[in-house]
């Protein structure tokens, strides 16, 4: 089979930045609790893209065995997805049999033919009911998936790109009556996890969900052009953004680990730090002017507080005095 796409300068730059960030992480250092939290985020986001109404808190409660009020179908989707994510990363990403087994795990009790390729034609519709894509004819689906996996298994392409292409082609083939988006996203993560185990725990789906319209637009543009370049670029941007979010998340954890420092701060200092910390958890860095607006304090007072937080290791600073930016510390 032939997958149409072009290697662009944008792709090369994104791949370089992704590889650079990956060298800074070690899966062994990631706490088991954080891995579980990221997996729950992945599940909730991937299901939300498919219109599951449950919140992150509700999904967490379901997975932890607590009762939740919600549509039975949505609850069943969460239970299935958690089982699938727990088992799929030991599967062979180029095995059609494993692919069908993963679909069965995701959809049993929800569709008529879980774990089976569809037997009828299928269309994808936009919000106005207009057909935007028609999947492959059902009689061709098994052969197309087999050809795709055989190509991917033997391709020398870097898995970063290959995983995007497999994801794209699965969405175009649309092999199942339901669950195609979930399977495409999950299978990309599986391929990536064979390249770097960290990808088993990265909540890529959360970033896709945050840019859901961009995701659909990239699919539509690449489908119309019969060229996956735009979709590959989009997914590489998603992967990079996910890694950048993880970097911020790890800084927050490190600060939390150093929380014993806080009792040594005076009450007002602790209050200001909590304000700054909450801001940094959302935005990543803060300047003196932003800190003044946030706290309502004078420039000199803010500088004194920020300098103190740097001194005790709660914050780090970069840049000149005038344009200095502060972020959560890592000592």
Task: Give names to the regions the model predicted.
Residues 1-331:
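FIC/Doc superfamily catalytic core
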